[in-house]
């Protein structure tokens, strides 16, 4: 009986971060998108557009601001547009009425309340531009020549590899798959 119910999708858990589920909620999503433990405003999902090659990690995207609901009887609403090749870091909050351009990194904990131009790395609350995306990537490529680089996927590392990594990263950072 359980297998029948699972086939009918009655007992299957709902993955609220699956691209398939979010598309059904009206969110426009490009290709190669990873949404990890994030909250996307499903009440106005049709106002969210996400480009291709985007990663969203433990972030919140809000298309509405209910601060005016009780005094005015209405919530403020606005679109959220996210370009291509974007990384949104842990605990970032994207507020309504904002556009994030292409080739952008939004740092962890960042609050995005205004548009972010293409080719930007932003940090802070409120968000501010730290540097250009291409400069950031160039700097990180240079660091890969002087820092430890680990070629085994983190979930496939042996205990010995984990210990080696632990020791090598005592006072520095490195790069992992």
List each model region and its residues:
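Domain-scale signature associated with acetyltransferase and cell-envelope carbohydrate enzymes
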Residues: 1-85, 92-94, 102, 118, ...
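Hydrophobic alpha-helical segments of small multi-pass membrane proteins
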Residues: 78, 108-111, 121
